[in-house]
């Protein structure tokens, strides 16, 4: 057999086409040739041709009812598309791989494939990356594997922060908190809730930060935590217009143990005019004082 990958591809293509003398496609033989051709192309750095060979090898494995091997080939094709900066194919190929893993009943690799796509697209297509991270989380949630999604929640929140969509980032930390609660991962849960509160404060939304704190305080584990005490001190300092106290809490060890992206934002607090916040609070009190 020729070791020329181009000739292998040509021969394999013929084996998949029906003719007057070939009444059924030889997908097994063709797939072996596509796989060998892909290796040959990769060895000679012909990544575009290797990618095409892997796509066809994946199709061949599908035709042989082998979705696991088909998924592996799609992931390899996606990695080559990334090397070639063909971003729409990166997303499409990893999504296809994920679907094939789901077909195998394998939630973890299905989620991992979407996570790989999201990481590849974070800088070039951040909105697509967010959707991929979201879908990756949902696959694990539906399979009852919430604890395996923690890093995905954080990664998605990080993309939102880069886009300065702080409220959306907070929402993902709250989702992380809910997932952590299901797994009895109390430390992760409390850190997630404090992170969400800091994000609301960074976005100048004291009212939402307070609502978030009050909602999270319904959970006993959070109410008794160091993270809850830090959140309470921050909110009190905001309401009192105490800039020094805000900076002190934001640089304390409890905040320093949060994710790096949250620490960076906390160090910049307060971002708004806290004296204006204090004046608004006092005005509200005056309006309520009818004596």
Curated annotation (Swiss-Prot):
Gene Ontology CC entries for this record: cytosol; membrane
Primary location: membrane
Membrane-protein topology: Peripheral membrane protein
GO biological process, one term: vesicle-mediated transport
Alphabetical UniProt keywords: ER-Golgi transport, Membrane, Protein transport, Transport
CDD domains in alphabetical order: SNAP (cd15832)
PANTHER family reported for this sequence: GAMMA-SOLUBLE NSF ATTACHMENT PROTEIN (PTHR13768:SF2), SOLUBLE NSF ATTACHMENT PROTEIN SNAP (PTHR13768)
Transmembrane helix keyword on record: no
Protein encoded by which gene: GSNAP
Family in the record: Belongs to the SNAP family.
Its biological purpose: Required for vesicular transport between the endoplasmic reticulum and the Golgi apparatus. Binds to SNARE complex and then recruits NSF to disassemble it.
Protein name: Gamma-soluble NSF attachment protein
Location(s), subcellular: Membrane
């Amino acid at each position: 057999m020729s070791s020329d990958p181009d000739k292998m591809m040509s021969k394999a293509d013929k084996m998949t086409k029906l003719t007057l003398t070939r009444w059924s496609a030889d997908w097994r033989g063709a797939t072996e040739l596509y796989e060998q051709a892909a290796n040959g192309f990769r060895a000679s750095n012909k990544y575009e041709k290797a990618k095409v060979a892997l796509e066809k090898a994946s199709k061949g494995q599908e035709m042989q009812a082998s979705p696991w091997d088909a998924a592996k080939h799609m992931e390899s094709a996606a990695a080559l598309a990334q090397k070639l900066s063909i971003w729409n194919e990166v997303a499409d190929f990893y999504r296809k791989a994920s679907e094939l893993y789901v077909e195998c009943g394998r939630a973890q690799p299905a989620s991992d494939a979407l996570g790989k796509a999201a990481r590849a697209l974070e800088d070039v297509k951040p909105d697509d990356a967010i959707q991929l991270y979201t879908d990756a989380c949902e696959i694990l949630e539906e399979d009852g594997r919430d604890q395996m999604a923690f890093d995905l929640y954080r990664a998605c929140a990080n993309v939102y922060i880069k886009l300065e969509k702080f409220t959306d980032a907070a929402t993902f930390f709250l989702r992380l908190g809910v997932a952590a609660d299901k797994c009895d991962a109390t430390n992760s849960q409390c850190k997630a809730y404090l992170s969400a509160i800091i994000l609301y404060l960074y976005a100048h939304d004291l009212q939402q930060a307070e609502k978030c704190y009050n909602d999270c305080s319904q959970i006993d584990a959070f109410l008794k935590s160091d993270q809850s005490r830090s959140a309470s001190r921050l909110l009190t300092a905001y309401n009192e217009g105490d800039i020094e106290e805000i900076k002190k809490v934001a640089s304390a060890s409890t905040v320093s143990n949060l994710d790096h992206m949250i620490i960076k934002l906390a160090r910049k607090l307060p971002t708004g005019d806290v004296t204006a916040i204090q004046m608004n609070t006092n005005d509200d009190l005056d309006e309520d004082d009818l004596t």
